[in-house]
Amino acid sequence: MKLNPIAFLVGCAGLVVGQTITDPAHIEVYVTPYYNSKGPAVDVGLFSSGLAAKSEPEFVATIEKMKKSWDTLNFPETYVAAIRLYDLGFRKESIYWFYSAQYRGRLFASLIDRDKMGSIGDPGFELFQAQNAFQQLVGPYINGYAFGDIDQLVPIIETVQREGKVVPDLTKIYPRIAFKPKSEWDAGNEGLNEGLTKLLVTLKNEKASIKQQRIERGMEAKFSKLTSKDLPKGLGP
């Protein structure tokens, strides 16, 4: 079977119009008001200063604190953590955070009441736009790296899928947002979870095709030399 473009499969692996990756080791993105790679500047609440820290021990300590609050993290702070993990060389770990953030962002977008999310300046509208921006802008970097080792990627996505089977209380994670009735949450989440099943099947069955497409698009040459280091023991997924 002929594989569809990787961008279609994962929803975020293709470059956005006007986006170029000049340095594959550094994610250069700006998603207002949550993250600006120049600085970096971070505004996602409680963990902002630690995520922006120049000190690696301070950053790692922040990741440890976030892991302890894993079930209640919102998608902007999870995306920013993925970006910073990637930039600081914890790239395998960044894959897990990225796919977790993507899942949470898509769940948010699926279950927000769009009739009540408002317009520019309203928190619901801004978050809805942010999940799309994070996914599109960050995906080419982390997927560019992650798709270079499908055998490593598959169990990470399986973990994210397993953790996503239970819908969190979104009203506590996003207290100012109006969502669809809770009676609709499970069905919305099931559709999202099934999407990962389809992605996993494709990844397992089409490794050779994916590899060839990466070579043809220059992704293999651009990302294959990147390395990854481990977080201190006990902090991985």
What are these regions (language model features)?
Residues 52, 87-88:
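Alpha-helix C-terminal capping/termination sites
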Residues 70, 86-87:
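Hydrophobic/aromatic side-chain positions at a characteristic register within alpha-helices
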Residues 2-9:
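Sec-dependent signal peptide recognition
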Residues 20-72, 104, 118-237:
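N-terminal alpha-helical interaction modules that lie
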